[in-house]
Amino acid sequence: KDYDLLAKEREISVVNQLTDQQTYLNPSVLKLILSNLISNAVKHSVQGGYIKIGTEDGWVFIENSCTLEEQDKFEQSFTTSSRQSKGAGLGLFVVKSLLENEEIDYHFERDDDHLVFFMKLPQVNPESD
């Protein structure tokens, strides 16, 4: 909801298909990861583009329409060991650090006009009572 205004200004369609799920992760950490990823997607999507948030095969994903140049910047943020890459904001550095600290698997897939970021959140084992 925090990004609705910016998304409206840029005519970006946001489709949130996330459902309530239990995960074994500090809610504050999860909120920080998601808010930074969504903020980045809104800021770097093409005018009139889209952002789609959902789950697929146990992975949470955020997909957004963006240029190849923006995809390069995003990839550099996650492949450099420090915050050296030009154009990589503090938000993505924080996301990478949190994901690695929490040992959360992540990857992304690129295409000509969009990027999809995936992360595998630790699930609560329903049989561990």
Predicted regions and their residues:
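Glycine-rich phosphate-binding loop
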Residues: 85-94
